[in-house]
Amino acid sequence: MAGRLHVEVRLQDGVIRAVDTRLQRPLPQISRLLVGQTAEAALRRLPLLFGLCAAAQQVAALRALERAAGWAAIAEVEEGRTRLGELESIRESLLRLVQVWELPVPLERLKALLALCRRAAARLQALTAFRAAPLPADAELEGTLAALAAAWADLQPPAPADWLRPRLDRWQEVALGGPPPQAFTADELPALLAQLRASDARAEIAGQPRLGGPAASAGAQATASAQIEQHVGALLRRTAQAIDSLQSPPAPPAVAGLAAGEGVGLARTARGWLLHRVCLDDGAVGTWQLLAPTDWNFHADGPLRRRLCGVRVAAGEVEALLRELILALDPCVAFEVKIVHA
């Protein structure tokens, strides 16, 4: 099911006076399709509902459902699932870097990297079963992961400024406004969980937006040029970190204080942490909530509004600037922009 992002900017006398960010996501419809299903049936439906980050959606859902059912996957299973999510993140990040940001990678090398990701993911697919058993030692998987790490090391991608300079120079004189929201941290999970239990699934903490993933690590830069460069650099660094983590996958953040029949699952995507919360009632789904990185990064009071309000930019440049900044924040849905001249 596809969502859509709408961003409207009001420009007056060469200054951005207002930014309206509206993210439309079919989360209530998705929830209705899953409520009433058994865990196994819900997991069979998930791949039909999500295109991007499909593996991460599956992993987060599995973790939530198994926790709600009172079953804890052993460390080897969790490590394999984390690897599966990271392989998807690597693949999606590479495609984004090449297709959107024109990372200069020879086509044959890109194809080889993507093929290694697919081959390794196929060896881990059995772990997407509910209450999956650990996989036997797999020399082919380990060899594929080693080949992926070697291929990435051999690639030696340049710094974003080296290949993006003509694209960035256009925005060197555009000074951005106030600071973006704070980054979401694992310490805030209890507060978020309390909100979700109260049927408040907004991507905020105590009424305040947060940032996640590469968007959070990019920081607040003075100019639009520097901000875009840092976002692309953060995505590049995240890709390298994901490849490194395949050798020793980290455990997902622990979620304490869950009630009987309640489960929360987290999975890292190319854009940040994905969260599913599930409640089971007599073995059937009673509640299903999810928050994705795009929900956080495109909050109505998020980085677009905070960084763009009050910014001076030529009328003929504002749409192109807006599109570049949206692409830098990397939404997982299609978007459209509208410029209103006051």
Curated annotation (Swiss-Prot):
One of its GO terms (molecular function) is nickel cation binding. InterPro entries: Ni-dep_hyd_lsu (IPR001501), NiFe-Hase_large (IPR029014), NiFe/NiFeSe_hydrgnase_LSU (IPR050867). Belongs to the HupK family. This is Hydrogenase expression/formation protein HupK. The lineage of its organism: Bacteria, Pseudomonadati, Pseudomonadota, Gammaproteobacteria, Pseudomonadales. The gene is hupK.
